[in-house]
């Protein structure tokens, strides 16, 4: 039944809708300005500035929402607006969006504002956008001076090499390239190596998104090659190789490699998008099967991704019948974790009380999750979606799960109209817990898992992250085989830690003691003590010592800390370093190491 008013008679309704849209437009203008600033910082190789910009942008959305709420409260007494006017506000807002270029994001902003003003009983499609109202299909900025979402290039006219060079130079990056002709030759060789020689069909063309994607120390060109009925995705990372000189680092030509650089374990890109839905639609064509929610999140529109994810969850619940269950694996001391087997995510709730030896609070744990959200995750820490007042049908909850919820988190539960409302939770991609992966794995899988675990911790270390609890159960294996950290309640900055060696025992009594014979401060870490917790399985021990024997040496950890304190930002690559042109085609390069090779090739970091 449609409860909407037949006439839009409320001037307040129109004024409130217009005020909300003006506030959204301000938010999106700031969002785009950040992407423009990212290009300038990248050209200057100001990596600390880029990090700072990315952190500030994450909190910008919530700041704009709060500003809008305060304006509506002060000027319109929003909490006391009656229901009919609120319905008119939504209809006026829809009318204002008919020619808007970010309507889906504006609808999400409307929801965010309303959720801070209205009671959750109003969270239905009469008052907020449970479903989208404005279509984004074929949406494009048709103003004469506007950049198109993507540009089409036709190699049949000028040849592939000239076309590729024009694609790169059209981005008008300020530093010159060290040797663009060499790099274009590497791209063409990589295409031949991957696909062999292929005949150009009449429709042979290359589509390239008009804006660069900035993250860490790279700027990515993203596009697709179309030839006959084939659509071939590609991404080309551009990096500084010497002060004031750029180079194409590689070309990624496989869908799985693109899915990794756009994965949930990486920080968000900075990319200037006039019509974000058009960018997302394009990315969906080169990464089919990747949820739109994840793509919106990866390009920095995490609130839109969060909104789409929740719609996906509701849609899945209406088309499935299995029950939420307690997640398999070792139960945590701090979080209660459950999952829906048919849905590839886990739901995590902070418990009301924590048994010893945990000494923390709900507020401290929430701050740890915010730390991870703001930090560069490097492909080694899972992103989380944070929700309030999530209503799940009681009929879909396993009885054992309900009992566990009532036991561990009673303060966060409300029963309402056949639903269990959870006041606060986090949602993450479901992964195979590393302890189960190693426990059940073949010899090859164990070697892969252990090698990945060591790489993950070492990369986190160089990014100033100390995981705290390094047990295998706190890491997961993604569908791409990457090991990712996902338990954040003990996480610390490495620079806040005091790396120590275990002092020698003073006497035989110390040596035989089951307790430390030395004082341990709250931020002291002793890498050499991790062995008993990580090397109990002989198969694990053998491969661990083969690949990561230095893991237990305090000098490794201290060296990373020292570099961080000196302001160094290491190089990380979201692809295997063997794909880098300088490694793959060394004969095309001179022997002088580039600026991205501060570490030896063997130490070069991967963060997939």
From Swiss-Prot:
Pfam families: AceK_kinase (PF06315), AceK_regulatory (PF20423). Its main location: cytoplasm. GO terms for molecular function: [isocitrate dehydrogenase (NADP+)] kinase activity; AMP binding; ATP binding; phosphoprotein phosphatase activity; protein serine/threonine kinase activity. Residues 589-608 are annotated as: Disordered. Its EC number is 2.7.11.5, 3.1.3.-. It is found in: Cytoplasm. Keywords: ATP-binding, Cytoplasm, Glyoxylate bypass, Hydrolase, Kinase, Nucleotide-binding, Protein phosphatase, Serine/threonine-protein kinase, Transferase, Tricarboxylic acid cycle. It catalyses: L-seryl-[isocitrate dehydrogenase] + ATP = O-phospho-L-seryl-[isocitrate dehydrogenase] + ADP + H(+). The active site is at 383. GO terms for biological process: glucose metabolic process; glyoxylate cycle; tricarboxylic acid cycle. ATP binds at residues 327-333, 348. GO terms for cellular component: cytoplasm. Bifunctional enzyme which can phosphorylate or dephosphorylate isocitrate dehydrogenase (IDH) on a specific serine residue. This is a regulatory mechanism which enables bacteria to bypass the Krebs cycle via the glyoxylate shunt in response to the source of carbon. When bacteria are grown on glucose, IDH is fully active and unphosphorylated, but when grown on acetate or ethanol, the activity of IDH declines drastically concomitant with its phosphorylation. Belongs to the AceK family. This is Isocitrate dehydrogenase kinase/phosphatase. It comes from Burkholderia ambifaria (strain MC40-6). The gene is aceK.
């Amino acid at each position: 039944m449609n409860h909407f008013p037949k006439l839009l008679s409320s001037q307040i309704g129109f004024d409130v809708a217009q005020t909300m849209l003006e506030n959204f437009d301000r938010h999106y203008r700031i969002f785009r300005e950040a992407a423009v600033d990212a290009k300038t910082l990248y050209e200057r190789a100001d990596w600390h500035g880029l990090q700072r910009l990315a952190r500030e942008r994450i909190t910008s959305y919530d700041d704009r929402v709060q500003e809008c709420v305060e304006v509506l409260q002060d000027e319109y007494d929003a909490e006391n607006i009656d229901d009919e006017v609120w319905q008119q506000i939504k209809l006026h807002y829809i009318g204002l969006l008919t020619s808007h270029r970010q309507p889906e994001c504006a609808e999400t902003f409307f929801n965010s504002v309303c959720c801070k003003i209205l009671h959750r009983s109003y969270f239905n499609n009469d008052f907020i956008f449970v479903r989208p109202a404005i279509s984004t299909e074929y949406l494009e900025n048709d103003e004469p001076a506007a950049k198109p979402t993507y540009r089409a290039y036709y190699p049949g006219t000028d040849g592939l090499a000239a076309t590729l060079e024009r694609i790169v130079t059209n981005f008008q990056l300020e530093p010159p390239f060290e040797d663009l002709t060499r790099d274009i030759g590497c791209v063409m060789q990589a295409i031949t190596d991957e696909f062999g020689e292929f005949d150009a069909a009449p429709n042979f063309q290359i589509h390239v998104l008009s804006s660069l994607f900035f993250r860490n120390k790279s700027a990515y060109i993203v596009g697709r090659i179309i030839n006959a009925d084939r659509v071939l995705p590609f991404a080309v990372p551009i990096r500084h190789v010497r002060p004031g000189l750029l180079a194409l680092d590689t070309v990624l030509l496989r869908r799985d490699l693109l899915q990794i650089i756009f994965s949930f374990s990486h920080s968000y890109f900075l990319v200037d998008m006039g019509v974000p839905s058009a960018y997302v639609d394009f990315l969906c064509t080169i990464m089919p099967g990747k949820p739109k929610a994840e793509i919106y999140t990866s390009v920095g529109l995490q609130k839109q991704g969060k909104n789409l994810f929740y719609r996906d969850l509701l849609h899945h619940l209406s088309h499935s019948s299995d029950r939420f269950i307690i997640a398999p694996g070792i139960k945590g001391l701090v979080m209660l974790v459950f999952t829906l087997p048919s849905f590839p995510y886990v739901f995590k709730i902070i418990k009301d009380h924590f048994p010893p030896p945990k000494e923390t609070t709900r507020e401290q744990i929430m701050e740890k999750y915010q730390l991870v959200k703001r930090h560069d995750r490097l492909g080694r820490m899972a992103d989380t979606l944070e929700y309030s007042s999530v209503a799940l049908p009681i009929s879909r909850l396993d009885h054992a799960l309900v009992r566990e919820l009532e036991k561990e988190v009673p303060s966060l539960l409300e029963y309402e109209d056949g639903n269990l409302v959870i006041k606060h939770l986090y949602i993450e991609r479901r992964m195979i817990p590393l302890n189960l992966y190693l426990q059940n794995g073949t010899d090859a899988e164990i070697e892969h898992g252990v090698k990945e675990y060591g790489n993950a911790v070492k990369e986190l270390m160089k990014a100033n992250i100390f995981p705290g609890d390094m047990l295998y159960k706190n890491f997961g294996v993604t569908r791409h085989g990457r090991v990712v950290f996902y338990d954040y309640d003990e996480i610390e900055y490495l620079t806040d830690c005091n790396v120590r060696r275990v002092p020698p025992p003073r006497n035989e009594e110390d040596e035989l003691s089951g307790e430390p014979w030395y004082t341990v401060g709250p931020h002291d870490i002793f890498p050499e003590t991790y062995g008993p917790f990580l090397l109990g399985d002989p198969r694990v021990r053998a491969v661990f010592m083969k690949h990561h024997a230095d893991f237990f040496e305090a000098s490794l950890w201290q060296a990373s800390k020292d570099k961080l304190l000196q302001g160094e930002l290491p190089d990380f690559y979201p692809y295997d370093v063997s794909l880098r042109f300088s490694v793959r085609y060394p004969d095309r390069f001179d022997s002088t190491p580039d600026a991205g090779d501060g570490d030896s090739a063997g130490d070069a970091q991967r963060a997939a």
